[in-house]
């Protein structure tokens, strides 16, 4: 978690080795980038993909951390950055006919989410 001055507060949270392909997760996180916390949660709850569940847990956890540790309201937060990186493959073998094996690669990925406080500037005339 990174703490700056009042207008630059941000919460950075990440999770590693989610058993899902990065391609499928990117399809979900591209929809919430730049939205406020409330809009992001609503989008994730109504999308029909399995990849929404870990992203929803992570966004909710980041907002709770910002509320508890830095005293920020959830309504003041927006999704500044979302990054999904490919992780390593879990390698398995599937038995095939005539004593052969077939390799199976189960992909993993890492998610990084940065929530920032909305800054409102008043223009002086």
Swiss-Prot record:
Where does the UniProt annotation locate this protein?
Plastid, Chloroplast
Which GO terms fall under molecular function for this chain's record? rRNA binding; structural constituent of ribosome
Q: Which GO terms describe its cellular component?
A: chloroplast; large ribosomal subunit
Q: Which UniProt keywords apply?
A: Chloroplast, Plastid, Ribonucleoprotein, Ribosomal protein, RNA-binding, rRNA-binding
Q: Does the keyword Ribosomal protein apply?
A: yes
- HAMAP family this protein is in? Ribosomal_uL22_B (MF_01331_B)
Q: How does it assemble?
A: Part of the 50S ribosomal subunit.
Q: What does this protein do?
A: This protein binds specifically to 23S rRNA. The globular domain of the protein is located near the polypeptide exit tunnel on the outside of the subunit, while an extended beta-hairpin is found that lines the wall of the exit tunnel in the center of the 70S ribosome.
Name the protein family.
Belongs to the universal ribosomal protein uL22 family.
Q: What is this protein called?
A: Large ribosomal subunit protein uL22c
Give the classification, highest ranks: Eukaryota, Viridiplantae, Streptophyta, Embryophyta, Tracheophyta
